[in-house]
UniProtKB/Swiss-Prot annotation:
This is Ribosome biogenesis protein erb1. One of its GO terms (cellular component) is PeBoW complex. Its main location: nucleus. The gene is erb1. It comes from Aspergillus oryzae (strain ATCC 42149 / RIB 40) (Yellow koji mold). Pfam families: BOP1NT, WD40.
Length: 783
């Protein structure tokens, strides 16, 4: 019975170790400790004081966290008195077992005798490891707390340990011992005395290692990596495009000339002796530099005022409310006093409230006196004062006197006809020279011809399936009916079947005359065709387009946005403003009679960005080319740059030349529309800058146009705000008088679609009528 109990007890506090296990659970287990425990203390488990610390460590090393959960907690009262004898027998038999066996049972308790002589099981205290939050006080630690050791100077001990025993004062060596200790310095020696123990203070190995790392500028913490990859919390998203693709400037790689000049100045000054090395001043020089005290009242003569002296303005005289005994009507009542006190100091009408003191001797000091004087001094010191002579001028007299719009009629005032049929935006329109037909082009890729007065559609052709028709223009002259339309990167020349057969036949002959000239030229070689600046060859249209009236196609390979005819009808210029268009092929001039295309510019126009539009002068061999910010005039006969016009706009959208521009009519006049909502009038005889700048639109201006005949001095502009504005602009031949500009009418009727309003405008050649094309898919005739 006793043997079974003791065996159960051993199972509760120990665990078996497999024979193949080569590694114990405790890292601190040592072989010499294990041998000593088995050889010396195996038969002496019942003694009280013979159990060594090595056995305790051995039991702790063999114990495991998992086994600790399964162990049963045993108290000394639960163990019977005869359990000790059975345990002794079991322990005696255990010594006879094989020492190499891994089934050794280690005990974590010892047997002592209680007061009645019975066996008492005393369990060892648990030693927490480094990961535990609990730590026991060392047995020899001084536990007196924060009390100074000077209190124990008259006692042989210096404190008490955890068990209440006295800690005796360590013996002090003689001077010879101190000398020997200083010669043979032990590891961790500091030369200091530990105040808690009275012994020499020695540093541990960990403290020495910490000091070594600090001295060597190393990181004290183990496993810390100071070069971990940076975590970009706010800029971790990779940017594909650079913030600035500008090339590095040359000044980054060339020595600074500015600094070289400054250095040479200093070198020259040193050579000339103007810059001397520093020398400490002598006592005589210090005496010469002493501060001299001047008598402030030595010269009391009055000095004349400065010529620019302006006397300070006088203070206003005091009123009745500032009197110490004001009339009763100036005294505030309770409501007014409360409102004044609750108001903000900046919102008060006055800085004080009138009071009635009865007599002058009862008047106290004014609390805001110093503040008011200080603010007045600040005003006199900081605020500039200027003498001004007042001019009595009527503002109305400064404005120019404009004639009444009723005196400048006729001009369009109302919508007469609406043209509907396009799907999507109507990008362009043009009225033919006879004034009978209207040609339009839109996003649906079709070019249509309408009867102007009735709005009836007469002819339509599908020029492109994907690309919109960007521009349509009639050939000048009434002898032929030829329509030029640009869709995508092709230009189409068509003869709509709307005129009488004689005019239609003449139109076909004009276009067909160029095929013979083109056939006489040798075809370009394969190497020339691969070049980008090779002029394109005019080709015949497809069968479906030929049946619709298209006679010739010019493949430019780049999108055309502008087309303008010469006044004689044999030349027209086109502009491809795309950013991907090479500079040498952006502007092209086409000859109708020869079926010839030429690129007059070899390089991109300097300054102002890519070209936007171009027009021929109505009476001179001059070509005007506009890029984003400037307009350049080229003399085609002399092949020279004549003039550079600077409108000052951010982005030029369109421009037009006055039809009567010549030296006889007072010089050339232009109007320029820009995407920054400005309409600019240029008189080239006055300046390259704008003569007038008109800002009447809320959005970008898309198109501007003069009336083609000199009969009506009218011009109009079209804007994305859905409105057209009609102006009167008269130009006289007198060089001493300037052009007069009068706003006449604002025409509204188009709906804003997709942030776009009116895209194009054109005038009737003989009447004061205009036609507009809108993004809402309609065209309107204004009369």
């Amino acid at each position: 019975m006793d043997a079974s109990k003791s065996s159960k007890k051993r199972k509760a506090v120990t665990r078996d170790v497999e024979e193949e296990a080569g590694v114990f659970s405790g890292d601190e287990l040592q072989v010499d400790v294990l041998d000593g425990a088995l050889s010396d203390n195996a038969n002496d488990l019942s003694s009280d004081e013979d159990v060594s610390d090595s056995e305790i460590e051995l039991v702790d090393d063999f114990s495991d966290e998992e086994d600790g959960d399964e162990e049963e907690e045993l108290d000394s009262d639960e163990i019977p008195s005869d359990g000790g004898e059975s345990f002794k027998k079991a322990s005696g038999t255990g010594n006879a077992r094989d020492e190499s066996s891994s089934d050794e049972e280690q005990l974590n308790y010892r047997i002592e005798k209680d007061a009645n002589g019975n066996d008492r099981y005393v369990y060892d205290e648990i030693n927490p490891d480094d990961n535990s939050d609990y730590s026991d006080v060392e047995e020899n630690a001084n536990t007196i707390g924060n009390i100074p050791l000077s209190f124990y100077d008259q006692y042989p001990h210096i404190g008490y340990d955890i068990n209440g025993k006295k800690i005796m004062r360590p013996a002090t060596g003689e001077a010879l011992d101190a000398l020997l200790d200083s010669i043979e310095i032990p590891k961790g020696w500091t030369g200091l005395t530990d105040p808690s123990t009275g012994k020499p203070l020695e540093l541990s190995q960990d403290e020495l290692e910490l000091l070594r790392k600090v001295q060597m500028n190393e990181i004290p913490e183990e496993g810390y990596n100071p070069y971990e990859p940076t975590v970009e919390w706010f800029s971790s998203k990779q940017e594909i495009m650079p913030l600035s693709a500008a090339p590095e400037p040359k000044r980054r790689f060339v020595p600074s000339k500015h600094e070289a000049k400054r250095v040479m100045k200093i070198v020259k000054a040193i050579r000339e002796g103007r810059i001397l090395p520093y020398k400490p001043p002598t006592e005589e020089e210090d005496k010469e530099q002493d501060v001299v005290n001047y008598d402030l009242w030595a010269d009391e003569t009055e000095r004349p005022d400065h010529p620019m002296h302006i006397p300070a303005p006088k203070l206003p005289p005091p009123g009745y409310e500032e009197s110490y005994h004001p009339p009763p009507e100036y005294l505030p009542d309770k409501k007014e006093r409360k409102a004044w006190e609750e108001a903000d100091p900046e919102d008060r009408e006055r800085e004080y409230l009138p009071n009635d003191f009865g007599s002058l001797r009862k008047v106290p000091g004014y609390e805001s006196f110093v503040k008011e004087k200080f603010e007045r001094c600040l005003d006199l010191y900081l605020a500039p004062r200027v003498r001004r002579s007042k001019l009595n001028i009527d503002p109305e007299s400064l404005l120019p006197k404009l004639p009444s719009p009723e005196e400048l009629k006729p001009f369009p005032t109302a919508c007469a006809t609406v043209f509907r049929g396009h799907k999507g935006r109507v990008r362009t329109l043009a009225v033919d020279p006879s004034g009978l037909w209207l040609a339009t082009g839109g996003d649906d890729g079709t070019a249509r011809v309408w009867e102007l007065l009735t709005g009836r559609q007469l002819w339509s052709v599908k020029l492109s399936e994907e690309d919109p028709v960007n521009v349509v223009r009639w050939r000048p002259g009434k002898d032929a009916v030829i329509l030029a339309a640009a869709a995508g990167d092709d230009i189409f020349l068509a003869v709509p079947p709307i005129a009488d057969p004689k005019i239609e036949k003449t139109s076909l002959e004009i276009i067909d005359a160029g095929w013979g000239y083109a056939a006489s030229k040798p075809p370009p070689s394969a190497a020339e065709e691969n070049k980008k600046n090779v002029p394109p060859q005019w080709i015949r249209p497809s069968l479906s387009l030929a049946e619709s009236g298209v006679c010739a196609v010019i493949p430019l390979r780049y999108v055309v946005k502008s087309l303008s005819w010469h006044r004689r009808g044999d030349y027209f210029v086109t502009v491809c403003p795309g950013s991907s268009t090479p500079a040498s092929v952006a502007i092209s001039i086409h000859t109708l009679s020869k079926h010839l295309t030429q690129f007059p510019f070899r390089r991109r126009i300097k300054g102002g960005g890519p070209p936007q539009t171009a027009h021929f002068h109505p009476s001179k061999p001059i070509l005007f080319v506009a890029n984003q910010r400037t307009i350049r005039a080229y003399d085609l006969s002399r092949q020279l740059l004549v003039k550079i016009i600077q409108p000052g706009a951010r982005w030029i959208s369109s421009f037009d030349i006055h039809p009567t521009s010549s030296t006889a009519s007072g010089g050339d006049n232009l109007i320029v529309g820009s995407y920054d909502r400005r309409l600019l009038w240029h008189d080239l005889e006055l300046s390259q800058r704008p003569y007038k700048t008109l800002r009447y639109h809320r959005k970008a201006i898309r198109s501007v146009r003069f009336h083609p005949s000199g009969r009506y001095p009218l011009f109009a502009d079209a804007s994305d705000d859905g409105s057209l504005q009609i102006f009167h602009g008269s130009v006289t031949g007198d060089m001493l008088s300037n052009a007069s500009i009068v706003p006449l009418k604002v025409l509204k009727g188009h709906k804003i679609t997709g942030e776009l309003g009116v895209l194009d405008v054109d005038w009737h050649p003989r009447e004061a009528w205009c036609v507009s094309a809108g993004a809402d898919g309609t065209c309107r005739l204004w009369m």
